[in-house]
Structures are given as structure tokens and as C-alpha cells.
Regions:
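Domain-scale signature associated with acetyltransferase and cell-envelope carbohydrate enzymes
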Residues: 1-54, 69-70, 78, 88, ...
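Glycine-rich hexapeptide-repeat left-handed beta-helix
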Residues: 50-52, 56-123
Length: 123
């Protein structure tokens, strides 16, 4: 019953988030087009801004999923894919595509190449 009810609500809102992926404190700022793979693990106090995807890369790699720490902030249109690990307090900018791990706490990742703004990369 629960799964059917959540599936109907998810279809209506455009959100697909399986059970037990996020820890407590998930906040979704805007509804619509949020897809999270059920094998991902995401820590406490995650914030999604809409039009996001968190999952595997496809290409037959069904066993590689992101592991994300606490206080994660994913900007509008941003994507996190592949078997990567992201540390705590990371912010991902709008429309960024994160495909590489970042173990530095408090990093700010932007763009396709995952430039870390907290390290002084401003280009």
C-alpha cells in the first residue's frame, strides 16, 4: 500500500526517491524532475533545488553509486553520477555535473570539470 501511494505522489510531483536513501533532514526546495537511484546513500540535512539526478552512469555499471556525506546542497539542474564519494558540507552549483570524488570538507563544486571554488579556482 505504502509503495503504491508514494509512487502515485512521485509521478504527480515528478520526483522518484526510493526508501532509505536519505538520512534525516532532506529538504526539497522545488518540486519536479528529481531522480535518485535506490542504491545511493546520502547523509543528514541534504538540500535539493530541483531538476536533479543522483545515480549511476549507466553504461552497464550497475554497481557504482554515489556515497554522499552530511549537509549536502545540490543546485538546480545539477547531476551527481558514478561510483564517487563526496565528503560533508559540500555545495554543488547549478547545472554542475559531478563525476569525480571530493573528500575535502566544505568544498564548492561547479561546472562540468568539478572545479572547487573553495581552493581558489575562480575560472
Amino acid at each position: 500500500f505504502y509503495a503504491r501511494r508514494m509512487n502515485k505522489l512521485g509521478i504527480r510531483l515528478g520526483i522518484y526517491i526510493p526508501i532509505n536513501v536519505f538520512d534525516i533532514g532532506l529538504k526539497i526546495d522545488h518540486y519536479g524532475s528529481i531522480v535518485v537511484n535506490g542504491m545511493c546513500r546520502i547523509g543528514k540535512n541534504c538540500r535539493l533545488h530541483g531538476n536533479n539526478c543522483i545515480g549511476n552512469k549507466g553504461e552497464g555499471r550497475i554497481d557504482e553509486f554515489p556515497m554522499i556525506g552530511d549537509n549536502f546542497d545540490l543546485g538546480t539542474g545539477a547531476v551527481v553520477i558514478g561510483g564517487i564519494t563526496l565528503s560533508n558540507n559540500i555545495k554543488v552549483g547549478a547545472n554542475a555535473v559531478v563525476t569525480r570524488s571530493c573528500l575535502e570538507e566544505g568544498a564548492g563544486l561547479v561546472g562540468i570539470q568539478n572545479k572547487n571554488l573553495r581552493k581558489g579556482n575562480t575560472k
